[in-house]
A protein has these predicted regions:
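Active-site-proximal or metal-binding-adjacent scaffold patches in catalytic folds
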Residues: 1-62, 71-82
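Walker B catalytic acidic pair
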Residues: 67
Length: 82
């Protein structure tokens, strides 16, 4: 997928979940072993650039939403049930 399209999608989803208001941002990183990351201390959600370039829209959106869920519940939750 085009990185500019992924950026627009991520920005839209962050805005939709009111994370932009809280200072959260989206960017790409160079990760090789994971798709996405939620960094609470930086208020930043990232996707691996290589992942974003090769995956389809549905998978990318799902990954961004997964990281947004982490941002919304906070650092103490990890992958447990809320």
């Amino acid at each position: 997928m085009e990185l500019s399209s992924v950026q627009l999608l991520a920005d839209h989803l962050l805005n939709e979940h009111e994370l932009f208001k809280k200072g959260w941002r989206f960017s790409f990183d160079r990760a090789k072993r994971r798709a996405g990351c939620c960094r609470y201390s930086k208020k930043e959600i990232t996707l691996a650039k290589a992942y974003a370039e090769q995956e389809e829209l549905k998978e990318i959106k799902n990954t961004i939403l997964h990281e947004i869920a982490h941002a919304l519940v906070g650092p103490k939750h990890g992958h447990n049930v809320i």
